[in-house]
């Protein structure tokens, strides 16, 4: 055990003192300097919104499809990149960026359209990698072949929104696919040597500390290259915000009697 602890301490030194390899550390090691993400909008939708699986999206998802800080969708991909770089470069002298397609489901479109926008992003001289946020059930063979093709040009990362391994919670948040679909997607991506980053949410309603740890233990055994640990973020106007304010009925809907109150900023200041 002492040897193991010593090994862990030595590893922390190589990770700048942290007990894990952070994204910032990995990017510096890989690209030789600080790298930022520029968040892009490919103008896509989601099967959980267009009626294929549902119309209201995941319970926590905003109207912006979790891409509220993405660039203006009316701009071309190149223009989006330039506008994002202009915003970021005013703060720090960053030279290298990752093109991150975040809003909605970014493989939920015809393959030729995906090829066009992804290649446009990757052709920018200051873009060093492509990161694509998507769903495991939107990775068909043609899409996988395209991603494999692009991965030979510059690194391609796929960010999958798993959130939890527990089916009961997945149904509550309206994730819209079974856990086995996630497993298959990871396997398919790794066969093509495409790196996978998994998004999880800590603090989902009804989940215990042990259930959260079960999700982490499961992912520790998977062939994935990164994990994003997100604290539950309740956005105004989402179904999650509504359901946390109101008591759930037996059929899973929300009662009209509020069980909590939101304190507005002005009210909070009056309490100080």
Annotate each predicted stretch with a short phrase.
Residues 64-84, 88-111, 126-139, 155-181, ...:
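Core AdoMet radical
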Residues 192-200:
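Short beta-strand/loop segments at the ligand-binding rim of alpha/beta enzyme cores
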Residues 111-119, 140-149, 210-212:
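Distinct, well-ordered alpha-helical segments
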Residues 1-57, 62-98:
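N-terminal [4Fe-4S]-dependent radical SAM core
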Residues 260-262, 268-270:
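Short linear proline/tyrosine/threonine-rich motifs used for host-factor recruitment
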Residues 205-220:
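Catalytic cores of alpha/beta
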Residues 246-251:
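Conserved small/polar residues in nucleotide/adenosyl-binding loops
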Residues 89, 118-125, 147-155, 187-191:
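Acidic (Asp/Glu)-rich catalytic clusters
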């Amino acid at each position: 055990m002492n040897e193991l602890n010593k090994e862990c301490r030595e590893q922390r030194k190589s990770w700048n003192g942290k007990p894990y390899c952070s994204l910032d550390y990995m990017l510096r090691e890989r690209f030789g300097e600080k790298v930022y993400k520029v968040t892009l909008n490919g103008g896509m939708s989601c099967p959980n919104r267009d009626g294929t699986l549902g119309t209201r999206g995941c319970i926590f998802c905003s109207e912006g499809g979790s891409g509220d800080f993405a660039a203006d969708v009316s701009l071309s991909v190149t223009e989006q990149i330039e506008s994002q770089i202009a915003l970021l470069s005013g703060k720090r002298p960053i030279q290298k960026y990752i093109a991150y397609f975040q809003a909605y489901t970014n493989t939920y479109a015809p393959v030729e359209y995906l090829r066009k926008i992804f290649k446009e992003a990757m052709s920018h001289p200051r873009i060093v990698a492509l990161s694509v946020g998507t769903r495991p059930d939107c990775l068909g063979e043609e899409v996988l072949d395209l991603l494999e093709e692009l991965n030979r040009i510059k690194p391609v990362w796929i960010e999958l929104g798993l959130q939890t391994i527990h089916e009961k919670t997945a149904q509550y948040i309206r994730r819209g696919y079974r856990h086995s679909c996630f497993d298959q997607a990871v396997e398919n991506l790794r066969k093509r040597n495409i790196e996978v980053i998994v998004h999880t949410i800590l603090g989902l309603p009804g989940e215990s500390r042990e259930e959260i740890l079960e999700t982490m233990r499961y992912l520790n055994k998977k062939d994935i290259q990164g994990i994003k640990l997100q604290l539950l973020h309740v956005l105004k106007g989402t179904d999650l915000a509504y359901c946390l304010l109101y008591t759930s009925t037996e059929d899973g809907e929300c009662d009209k009697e509020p069980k909590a109150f939101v304190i507005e900023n002005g009210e909070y200041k009056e309490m100080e």
